[in-house]
A protein has these predicted regions:
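Glycine/small-residue-rich loop that forms an oxyanion/phosphate-binding "nest" at active or ligand-binding sites
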Residues: 40-107
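Conserved, mostly hydrophobic/aromatic
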Residues: 18, 47, 83, 110, ...
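Glycine-enriched alpha-helix->loop->beta-strand junction motifs that scaffold or abut catalytic
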Residues: 20-26, 50-54, 87-90, 115-120
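Active-site beta-loop-alpha junctions enriched in small/polar residues
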Residues: 8-12, 31, 58-64, 96-98, ...
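Hydrophobic, well-structured mid-protein blocks that either form specific transmembrane helices
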Residues: 87-138
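Hydrophobic faces of well-ordered beta-strands that scaffold small-molecule active sites
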Residues: 3-7, 26-28, 55-59, 91-93, ...
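Catalytic cores of alpha/beta
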Residues: 10-21, 65-82, 128-138
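N-terminal pre-domain/capping segments
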Residues: 1-26, 31-38
Length: 138
């Protein structure tokens, strides 16, 4: 039985170490000390150039929670489009409302964009901050 090994990488160098260590795929971020934020397109491009495993990229403009303004969401949406065009195999994200429920509107819009590009949409640790109800699982 094969277990998929995914490594959270905070840099291009981290990704190369994961690749040499035979990881199956990575979640690429930046600034892990802040819980991870969106890496640069240059970082994604280099990782895709120098490895051949799937690279799922975090979309998060800042630390300090997962509740975003409309302007922040618009930037995240456009950044997602850009990262998909630069080879991201999946997008890792999470949108919450002020009451810690999942922001269905933002989530649906980003999932639609990612799936329209035939890539994987992945909810990150924002899920761990949700209200403890089964609706979050849907």
């Amino acid at each position: 039985m094969h277990c998929t090994v995914e490594i959270c990488c905070g840099s291009y160098e981290d990704a190369l170490v994961a690749y040499k260590g035979n990881a199956d795929r990575i979640e690429l971020t930046a600034a892990l000390y802040m819980g991870g934020v969106t890496p640069s397109t240059a970082c994604v491009t280099l990782v895709k150039r120098d490895t051949d495993f799937p690279v799922c990229v975090m979309i998060r403009p800042r630390g300090a929670g997962f509740c975003y303004s409309h302007a922040e969401f618009e930037c995240m949406y456009e950044e997602t489009r850009d990262l998909l065009n630069h080879g991201a195999d999946g997008i890792v994200f999470g949108f919450l409302n002020p009451d810690f429920s999942i922001n269905d509107e933002y989530t649906a819009k980003l999932v639609e964009l990612v799936h329209a590009n035939h890539k994987e949409a992945i909810m990150h640790r924002a899920f761990d901050c949700t209200s403890a109800d089964t609706r979050a699982l849907e």
